[in-house]
Amino acid sequence: MLDLVKELGVTCVRYPGGNFVSNYNWEDGIGPRENRPVRRDLAWHCTETNEMGIDDFYRWSQKAGTEIMLAVNMGTRGLKAALDELEYVNGAPGTAWADQRVANGIEEPMDIKMWCIGNEMDGPWQVGHMSPEEYASAVDKVAHAMKLAESGLELVACGSSGAYMPTFGTWEKTVLTKAYENLDFVSCHAYYFDRGHKTRAAASMQDFLASSEDMTKFIATVSDAADQAREANNGTKDIA
């Protein structure tokens, strides 16, 4: 895996990824592996052993030469858990969570700057699913507090789960307008793959290759929402 990541030139990897994060307790993945609890994973209806945690992923990223984008659980948790996690990861020794990191074998702060606040919270399949207004209020509070705790963070709001969502575009405009001052990026979630029409292999590949046109429209819609949010706030910065 490490060799493949290096060969591909991957520069940044999100952790934890996907729907999993909305029911994830980051504290479960630190300390000795034999002491870590096994939990139910509500996203994929299985059990999570927590054999891989923040410390382990940080060490892996050091070997892989990649930066980390840490994802915050906005499904079952929120503000307090995010601040504790930030302290554990980036805090200088001398506070409870930072000292716990040192005790777990990582003396220096990890200095992780990019944080994704939630994952696909517009999706009804997501644990803690929210309306645009609910997520806008929640992400604004979490992002504001995180930037009070540490300057220089780059915070990412979760955008729509796809262009097929009924609130696509409206979601981005609502969220970015409310939390404009505290956000830096919005994520674009779009998945393209060869759908494998057995009797239409050539057509299937053509559809797949044409997906770049759909992605261009997707980005344009999100960019337009970001521009409207900037104008509504009389702002000068661009949300990417």
What positions do the PLM features span?
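Short glycine-enriched loops at secondary-structure junctions
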Residues: 19, 189-192
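Non-catalytic accessory regions flanking glycosidase/transglycosidase catalytic cores in CAZymes
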Residues: 1-171, 176-185, 212-240
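Active-site His/acidic residue clusters
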Residues: 192-207
